[in-house]
A protein has these predicted regions:
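HotDog/MaoC-like acyl-thioester-processing domains
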Residues: 1-17, 93-97, 101-143
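Short, charged/polar low-complexity linear motifs in solvent-exposed/disordered segments
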Residues: 35-37, 49, 83-84, 111-112, ...
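Short, loop-centered acidic/histidine patches that primarily coordinate divalent metals
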Residues: 68, 89, 103
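Mid-chain, well-packed structural core segment of small domains
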Residues: 74-100
Length: 143
């Protein structure tokens, strides 16, 4: 979880968020389907997934985006993300250990807001990038 309030003055360009690691399980897929309402059988039906040419069932893209979003929120604090977009580059598979990488790429002030831009990546243990993204957070200032 987060480290408490993070202020604009406490973050520098090049800072990295703590890495969040999660091994994707089939239980994650079923639980996410129930929570999201996304019951696409490609995420839970092995027979259908292999018949469609996939090696197995695979993770929901939005689950991956959510995992990366959790690491972002833990780093900049709840309610501070004002922009977040991602591109899905590869599927995630049960058994893969996924890990986040979040780096501060810029700090700026705009219209009285103290903004931090971040580059975000979710990759597996072999270094295959699954999700790439960017985010902007508006942080409180000490000043």
């Amino acid at each position: 979880m987060g480290e408490g309030i993070r202020y604009y003055e406490d973050i520098d360009k090049g800072d990295e968020a703590p890495v969040l690691r999660h091994t994707l399980t089939r239980t994650d897929l079923v639980r996410y389907a129930g929570a999201s309402g996304d019951y696409n059988p490609m995420h839970h039906d092995e027979i259908l997934a292999t018949a469609a040419g996939q090696p197995s069932v695979f993770g929901h893209g939005m689950f991956s985006m959510g995992l990366l979003g959790t690491a972002l929120t833990d780093f900049v604090g709840p309610g501070n993300i004002i922009h977040y977009k991602v591109r899905f580059s590869r599927q995630t598979w049960p058994g893969e250990e996924l890990s986040t990488s979040i780096v501060v790429t810029a700090k700026r002030e705009d219209d009285g807001k103290h903004l931090v831009d971040l580059e975000c990546t979710l990759a597996n243990g072999e270094g295959e990038v699954k999700v790439v993204g960017e985010a902007t957070a508006a942080l409180p200032s000490r000043g």
